Structures are given as C-alpha cells and as structure tokens.
C-alpha cells in the first residue's frame, strides 16, 4: 500500500523536473538568442562598409534567430497553457527549419523540390489542426 502511494507521486515529481529543465532550457535559448542578435547587428554594421561576401549567411543566421525565438515562445506557451505544448508551434518550427535548409543548401533542384513538398505537408497538417480546433470550439 505504501509503494502505491509513492508511485502516485511520481508523475508530479517528473512534471516538476520537466518544468525545471524547460526553465533552464529557456534561459539557455535566451542567451543564444542574444548571441544571434549580436551577430546580426555586427553583420549589418559590416554590410554598411561592404565587407560582406554573402548575404546567404546572414539569412541563415536570421532564420536561426527565429527558430530560437519560436522555441522560447513554445516554452512560454507551455507554461501558460497548463503544461501543454500546442502542436501548431511544432509545425511553425518545422516549417522555419526546412525553409532555412532550403536557403542554405539549394544546389540540387530535386532536393529543394522534396523539401518544398515537406513544407506543403506541414502546411496541410497545420490547416487540419486549425480546422479541428475551430470545429471543437464551436
């Protein structure tokens, strides 16, 4: 009987551990976001004096910035929505990641095509999730 009572506490302890880990992850991601912001500011400053070879690097870093931002927003949403990750945020992050991949590595047309199909699939999934949520709300 005593083991049973301790076992019932396990989900609460694991939830607390998860919350603490996500909090520290958000702090680490915030540091990385600040680092990316500094890199972008330096890049813009260098571009004013034409010391930049390629703007693709800047675009890639900008998309990494948005990915950090989206992960932080996901963690904030997790805490605000009673410890639940909304699926649409994962879809946003997936679309951003694939767009970054296409921008950085677009040498082979067939690969770009398949990555674009992956984005289309995620957009369809996003539409289905939003439609399901709007039907459930009404």
UniProtKB/Swiss-Prot annotation:
Keyword Metal-binding in annotation: no
Pfam families with a match to the protein in the record: PsiE (PF06146)
GO biological process, alphabetically ordered: cellular response to phosphate starvation
Coiled-coil ranges per UniProt: none
Topology in the lipid bilayer: Multi-pass membrane protein
Family stated for the protein in its record: Belongs to the PsiE family.
Protein name: Protein PsiE homolog
Organism: Bacillus velezensis (strain DSM 23117 / BGSC 10A6 / LMG 26770 / FZB42)
